[in-house]
Amino acid sequence: MEKKLSSENNQLSSENILGLLPHRYPFALVDKVIENIPGERAVAVKNVTINEPQFQGHFPERPLMPGVLIVESMAQVGGIIVTQMQNLPKGLFVFAGINNVKFRKPVVPGDQLIISCDLLSIKRQRFGKVKGEAHVDGKLVCSGELMFSLVD
């Protein structure tokens, strides 16, 4: 599948994202990219809806988006940055670690996560690190550093 950007502000549609990332329902956690500087930075949207499967058990009486899924959403935005880097080998980059992750506010159905990631480093064309932040209504809800590794 060819990787095409929409013409407006280098945005990526959900179809573009599916062409870049291997994730599929129910684990595709990025709805669209609203700012995209390939290999450097991406800002994306994740709309949190009550019909997502995790809310059946987390928690039925008071649904909260699990923190691990917020972090995974940030990792997927980081993956969008890495997969567009022309000088890296093609292959599957996987989540390899997290540092300094903090959860500051709960995320609930109806919220819209605005996730920004900035590339911090690439080493030996196999390992990457991004800084990620997730905001709801302009308030920081999660932040941290995420590491990626190319698997053979």
Swiss-Prot record:
InterPro entries reported for this sequence: FabA_FabZ, FabZ, HotDog_dom_sf
Protein name according to UniProt: 3-hydroxyacyl-[acyl-carrier-protein] dehydratase FabZ
Source organism (scientific name): Prochlorococcus marinus (strain AS9601)
One GO CC term, this protein: cytoplasm
Top-level taxon of the source organism: Bacteria
MF terms in GO: (3R)-hydroxyacyl-[acyl-carrier-protein] dehydratase activity
Organism taxonomic ancestry: Bacteria, Bacillati, Cyanobacteriota, Cyanophyceae, Synechococcales
Record's keyword terms, sorted: Cytoplasm, Lipid A biosynthesis, Lipid biosynthesis, Lipid metabolism, Lyase
Protein's job: Involved in unsaturated fatty acids biosynthesis. Catalyzes the dehydration of short chain beta-hydroxyacyl-ACPs and long chain saturated and unsaturated beta-hydroxyacyl-ACPs.
Family listed: Belongs to the thioester dehydratase family. FabZ subfamily.
Alphabetical GO biological process terms: fatty acid biosynthetic process; lipid A biosynthetic process
Subcellular location: Cytoplasm
Main subcellular location of this protein, as a coarse class: cytoplasm
Reaction it catalyzes: a (3R)-hydroxyacyl-[ACP] = a (2E)-enoyl-[ACP] + H2O
Active site positions: 58
PANTHER family: 3-HYDROXYACYL-[ACYL-CARRIER-PROTEIN] DEHYDRATASE
Keyword Transcription regulation (UniProt): no
Record-listed E.C. numbers: 4.2.1.59
